[in-house]
């Protein structure tokens, strides 16, 4: 069955909450793909053998990941393009020209769409400016972040995604800096012509990684008023502390009660930097059932998982969404 445009679908179904997939990069790592490189989870797509050999091991792994998230209940899924800015790709892979770069993005989107089918929604994932210098978890964009040309950085990926009708939504993920947020919100329909969302990289204390409060973020949006791009569809939090995420989302909801929100936190596991392994967190306070219930009461329309969330987590999220909607 052909899918309705996403905004129309959610408008026609005001109580519907869509289940997002989970942490693709860490899930591919769990399945044996070595993602520890500057282009992160995009790495399997760089090899020509991924495209020329349908029986290649990495191709099978990526297809199985998508399939497992679908079987777990995901209704909206992402392209594996978080670290796929033109700058990152051209500086760290054999792909150099814009033509080669656009071919890579088109291939990834086509492959993702074929994996999930025509009835599910597909997000074109775009990581933050800070991802190419590993600053998405600090928000430290240097002494003069207001002078960074964010548009030139995002332009190649954004222009490609704008033109691709196989995408339903563009997702700016893990945005940690207020100047980057302001830049994205300043772009009109000539720059961002497809529905989009912004996922904020938020400290466990409830502020943007650069220290900006949720109230200050809300004021930026309120000040834009009717100048804001009508394609701005959702605001939310991602790659955030599992325990603190419900309170953070609620603070956004209180500040912007009419804004459609989304949430996809990390699993709650803790990374041991010495042993370089993920460990269960004895301080994990809540279950997915509890967290999802709180997200829904705070206006979330899309709920999923980020780092270390697996198909099992998405299955639990899906069950909770069905229970509370």
Swiss-Prot record:
Induction or repression: Up-regulated in response to high extracellular methionine.
EC number(s) per entry: 2.1.1.10
Keywords: Amino-acid biosynthesis, Cytoplasm, Metal-binding, Methionine biosynthesis, Methyltransferase, Nucleus, Phosphoprotein, S-adenosyl-L-methionine, Transferase, Zinc
Annotated GO biological process: homocysteine metabolic process; L-methionine salvage from S-adenosylmethionine; methylation; S-adenosylmethionine cycle
Keyword match Iron: no
Domain Hcy-binding: 6-321
Modified residues (Phosphothreonine): 138
A Pfam entry, by short name: S-methyl_trans
Subcellular location per the Swiss-Prot or TrEMBL entry: Cytoplasm; Nucleus
GO molecular function, one term: metal ion binding
Obligatory cofactor(s): Zn(2+)
Sites where the protein binds Zn(2+): 239, 306-307
InterPro entries associated with the record: HCY_dom, HCY_dom_sf
Keyword Nucleus: yes
Lineage: superkingdom: Eukaryota
One Gene Ontology term, aspect cellular component: cytoplasm
Enzyme class: transferase
Catalytic activity: S-methyl-L-methionine + L-homocysteine = 2 L-methionine + H(+)
Biological role stated in the UniProt entry: Homocysteine S-methyltransferase involved in the conversion of S-adenosylmethionine (AdoMet) to methionine to control the methionine/AdoMet ratio. Also converts S-methylmethionine (SMM) to methionine.
Additional comment: Present with 60300 molecules/cell in log phase SD medium.
Protein name as catalogued: Homocysteine S-methyltransferase 2
The species this protein was found in: Saccharomyces cerevisiae (strain ATCC 204508 / S288c) (Baker's yeast)
Gene: SAM4
């Amino acid at each position: 069955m052909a899918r309705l445009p996403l905004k129309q679908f959610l408008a026609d179904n005001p109580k519907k909450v869509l289940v997002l997939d989970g942490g693709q990069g860490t899930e591919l790592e769990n399945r044996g793909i070595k993602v520890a490189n500057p282009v992160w989870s995009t790495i399997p797509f760089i090899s020509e053998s991924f495209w020329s050999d349908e029986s290649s091991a990495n191709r099978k792994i990526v297809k199985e990941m998508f399939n497992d998230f679908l079987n777990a209940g995901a209704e909206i899924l992402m392209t594996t393009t978080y670290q796929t800015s033109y700058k990152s790709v051209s500086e760290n892979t054999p792909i150099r020209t814009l033509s080669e770069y656009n071919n890579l993005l088109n291939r990834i989107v086509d492959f993702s769409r074929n994996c999930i089918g025509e009835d599910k929604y597909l997000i074109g994932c775009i990581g933050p400016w800070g991802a190419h210098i590993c600053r998405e978890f600090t928000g430290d964009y240097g002494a003069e972040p207001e002078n960074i040309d964010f548009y030139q950085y995002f332009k190649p990926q954004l222009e490609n995604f704008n033109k691709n009708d196989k995408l339903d939504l563009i997702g700016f993920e893990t945005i940690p800096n207020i100047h980057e947020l302001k830049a994205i919100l300043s772009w009109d329909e000539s720059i961002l012509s497809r529905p989009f969302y912004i996922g904020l990289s938020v400290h466990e204390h409830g502020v943007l990684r650069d220290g900006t409060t949720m109230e200050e973020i809300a004021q930026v949006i309120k000040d834009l008023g009717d100048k804001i791009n009508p394609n701005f569809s959702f605001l939310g939090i991602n790659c955030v502390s599992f325990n603190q995420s419900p309170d953070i989302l609620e603070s956004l909801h209180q500040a912007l009660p009419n804004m459609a929100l989304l949430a996809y936190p990390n699993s709650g596991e803790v990374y041991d930097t010495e042993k370089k392994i993920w460990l269960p967190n004895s301080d994990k306070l809540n279950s997915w059932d509890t967290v999802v219930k709180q997200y829904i009461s705070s206006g979330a329309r899309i709920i999923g998982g980020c780092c270390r969330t697996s198909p099992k987590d998405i299955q639990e999220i899906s069950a909770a969404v069905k229970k509370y909607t």
